[in-house]
């Protein structure tokens, strides 16, 4: 292998994740001069990027600007560190796109990442890489690959709850039913924004992280019981509405359903308590990235 790195990279609208366990909020603050804090600081092409703040706007076509590539560099740096490579690294990426626009954007997304002699600095350490190859895989299906043997001989639903979209499709005997692929504009960020708006009516301002903690049953700060009840009720309504919409698209919840994406992990308790879903399997937020790497390794062995 030498200086070669294979990396599964999930460029989510909410978080950027890798097969090696790296995760960061998909956003940055850009400046022309060095900021006060050097934490998570990327320096690339003479610009300074504080990674993890100011979430990027939603882009179905991520090749229209450099934002996704910028967010990918710290993720690659993490993989270089894990591999303990000190010289220039040759990187082969496995990335993904939602199934609904996989065919139209696949070629463009692959070419977007292919670059030679990329130099950058992250967290006060310099890196030099060549991205020598990039393969693009269907998002959601890639996560199923991590548990493929459990579902290869049956029909199952796959529901990927992401930041901005909920992507759904069926897989039968290991093959995607392309006629069942849909993307709903109802990702977890819409729930959080609605909760924030509702709480503002009572002059309560909660951060996204605080709301997520309350949904998970944690106690980030002491709030009145009615605040938590509002969040609980709205989250339950969101889950039931999503499941009802999915049923309207012809999905049968008597079949096993695989939930993937960070939103699924956040909502797991509510999904499990729903009377709609008979059997649910939950894959963690790194499942797509891990699946990309598995598919990449399989493809390169052929």
Question: Where do the model's predicted regions map?
Answer:
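PRPP/pyrophosphate-binding module of the type I phosphoribosyltransferase fold
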Residues: 168-173
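A contiguous pocket-lining binding segment that forms or flanks enzyme active sites
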Residues: 198
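Ser/Thr-glycine-rich phosphate-binding loops at phosphate-binding pockets of nucleotides
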Residues: 161-167
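Short, basic interhelical loop/turn and adjoining N-cap
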Residues: 203-206
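Nucleotide/phosphate-binding catalytic cleft detector across ATP-hydrolyzing
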Residues: 1-157, 175-190, 209-302
């Amino acid at each position: 292998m030498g200086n070669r790195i294979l990396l599964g990279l999930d460029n989510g609208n909410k978080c950027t994740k890798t097969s090696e366990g790296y995760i960061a909020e998909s956003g940055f603050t850009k400046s022309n001069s060095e900021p006060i804090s050097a934490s998570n600081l990327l320096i690339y092409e003479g610009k300074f990027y504080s990674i993890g703040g100011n979430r990027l706007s939603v882009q179905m076509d991520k090749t229209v600007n450099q934002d996704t590539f910028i967010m990918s560099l710290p993720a690659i740096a993490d993989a270089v560190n894990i591999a303990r490579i000190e010289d220039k690294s040759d990187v082969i990426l496995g990335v993904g796109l939602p199934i609904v626009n996989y065919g139209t954007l696949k070629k463009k997304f692959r070419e977007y990442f292919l670059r030679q002699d990329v130099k950058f600095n992250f967290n006060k350490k310099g890196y030099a890489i060549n991205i020598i190859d990039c393969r693009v895989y269907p998002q959601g299906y890639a996560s199923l690959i991590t548990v493929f043997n459990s579902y290869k001989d049956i029909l199952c639903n796959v529901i990927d709850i992401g930041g901005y979209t909920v992507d759904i499709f069926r897989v039968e005997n290991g093959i995607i039913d392309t006629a069942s692929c849909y993307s709903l504009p109802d990702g977890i960020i819409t729930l959080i924004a609605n909760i924030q708006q509702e709480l503002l009516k009572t002059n309560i301002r909660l951060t996204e992280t605080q709301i997520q903690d309350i949904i998970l049953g944690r106690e980030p700060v002491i709030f009145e019981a009615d605040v938590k009840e509002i969040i609980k009720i709205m989250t339950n309504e969101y889950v039931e509405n999503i499941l009802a919409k999915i049923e309207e698209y012809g999905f049968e919840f008597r079949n096993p359903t695989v939930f993937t994406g960070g939103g699924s992990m956040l909502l797991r308790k509510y999904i499990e308590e729903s009377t709609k879903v008979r059997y649910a399997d939950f894959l963690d937020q790194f499942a797509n990235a891990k699946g990309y790497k598995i598919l990449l390794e399989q493809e390169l062995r052929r």
